[in-house]
């Protein structure tokens, strides 16, 4: 048993002062430090009045397999970026070997994240995710818009899914990812989602990320028309959005991006068991615009970094700073609190893990950070945490300590 007495606790919904947290694998009690010491006389006690305790972050959408990318891929617009991914994929993927993946996962923990949703296209990151201290939902992704190759792509997906399923435990879950409505044939998507239904698996899908996707699915025109003709000799989309969305009706699904979703699609998704995953830096770097949070207010959303194929960092503090600034119509102090909640409790809810809150009975997935210097108004803590934090002092996952390097 351990007891931590910080300056304040961000639960994250409220700020608690003059209290301490007693925890082992789970949070056992929140009370005055004196009462906790009486209750747990053998506990190790840490007083740190220059720190804040808040839940660990959940990063529900990232692609580990492209973690070797720094300046190889082209940013600025979605289609040139996609061409660059295809052009450099075979060079980039082998560069992130086991050591690279291990270092990437370690850096994720060191920056305050305690749970992730890892989208895996090839399964090369499976062992690293299994071995990590992180809580991981491992999304086995299916892709393929050509009906002739659907059986081959499904077989690959099924093999990867069952391989990951063998390793399930309280920290690791196997899940299903459908790449997108423009890149996965209806039949292939349905077969993969039938597996998700059979096993009660969480699902992730990129949906309405770019203007190009919107134009292609609505009209069969735009920049994707040239792309699909050139690479796959396809002249029309393989899905209409209404039929595609119906496939997810009975599933818990994370709809990633949603920048270009229309009102009808938003209403449909709002009627499902769904979360939206907002990736502001990725959306900015690929020229996709900004998610309208007012339009999607009927659907819970969480914050994620996406992968290093479309971001410079997997640090959620960087993502929160970006989110704060790309939504200028939101009042800064109240929006900062909302963002902290979206990065903790909402992310945990999206992934289905226990945690994301400093509350009795929750898993002790927490981070201890420096108190911003010169704080005069406690209610401004959320904003100053985002502005002035890059890394925590310590991170705890189910009570296990990870100290800043």
UniProtKB/Swiss-Prot annotation:
Gene3D superfamilies: Metal-dependent hydrolases, Urease, subunit C, domain 1
Disulfide bonds: none
Keywords: Hydrolase, Iron, Menaquinone biosynthesis, Metal-binding
Cofactor: a divalent metal cation
GO molecular function, one term: hydrolase activity, acting on carbon-nitrogen (but not peptide) bonds
Positions with a binding annotation for a divalent metal cation: 61, 63, 206, 306
Pfam families: Amidohydro_1 (PF01979)
The UniProt record lists the keyword Hydrolase: yes
Cofactor binding summary note: Binds 1 divalent metal cation per subunit.
Binding site for substrate: 141, 145, 179
Catalytic activity of the protein: 6-amino-6-deoxyfutalosine + H2O + H(+) = futalosine + NH4(+)
GO biological process, one term: menaquinone biosynthetic process
Pathway: Quinol/quinone metabolism; menaquinone biosynthesis
Active-site residues per Swiss-Prot or TrEMBL entry: 209 (proton donor)
EC number(s) per entry: 3.5.4.40
Family of the protein in this entry: Belongs to the metallo-dependent hydrolases superfamily.
UniProt function note: Catalyzes the deamination of aminodeoxyfutalosine (AFL) into futalosine (FL), a step in the biosynthesis of menaquinone (MK, vitamin K2). To a lesser extent, can also deaminate 5'-methylthioadenosine.
The name this protein goes by in its record: Aminodeoxyfutalosine deaminase
